Amino acid sequence: MFSLISAGVAPGVALLSYFYLKDEYEAEPLSFVLRMFLFGVLLVFPIMFIQYVLAAEGIVASPAAEAFLSAALLEEFVKWFVVYFFVYDHDEFDEPYDGIVYSASVSLGFATLENILYLLANGVETAIARALLPVSSHALFSVIMGFYFGKAKFAVKKRRYYLWASFLLPFFLHGVYDWLLLAKERWGYYMGLFMLALWWAALRKVKQAKGYARPQAVPPVKSQA
């Protein structure tokens, strides 16, 4: 049991550590990061219940509906909601890269408990595949989300546009990911290409977010009198 739970926890903790340590200006308070991680953990059960109801009522009768409605829309919106209402206006969100750290915290909390439950049901032999696909995909969706949260927080213009992008892009990518899994026809080939493109895009966003200048307060103008 210990080895199974360890296998379930390790990918999420490793990915969160990676994104956390990439913050080169000022590391975020670990207590706040862990709080957001636990928020993500707590999201699993209500989301699973809603997904069960959607399936039982026949609302998600097709692979596309299951991928984009039951999985992508529900999961990404709830994670977006948590980051927006608990992090976006927080004093600790003081540089663009912080959006990635906190979005990853919520998403990887969710992905970690989901991963543990899956391994308990299907065995530890699925751990590597789970780490490479579901856990890492949640992390990569969160990088896109967090990047645009950072843009929205500190942009002078287009803040509403970036906020919409912080939800719509992860939602779309998550929907495509689940649809490829459910399509089954040559899914391994297309999924490999999709994940490579997703990793490339996410790491590029990490680099871009790190490169943005940290916002500085404008010094007051001294009186000439």
Curated annotation (Swiss-Prot):
Subcellular location: Cell membrane
GO function terms (MF aspect): peptidase activity
TM annotation in the entry: 1-23, 31-53, 100-121, 130-151, 180-202
Protein family per UniProt: Belongs to the protease PrsW family.
PANTHER family: PROTEASE PRSW (PTHR36844:SF1)
Function: Involved in the degradation of specific anti-sigma factors. Responsible for Site-1 cleavage of the RsiW anti-sigma factor. This results, after two other proteolytic steps catalyzed by the RasP and ClpXP proteases, in the release of SigW and the transcription activation of the genes under the control of the sigma-W factor.
Name of the protein this chain belongs to: Protease PrsW
Species whose genome carries this gene: Geobacillus kaustophilus (strain HTA426)
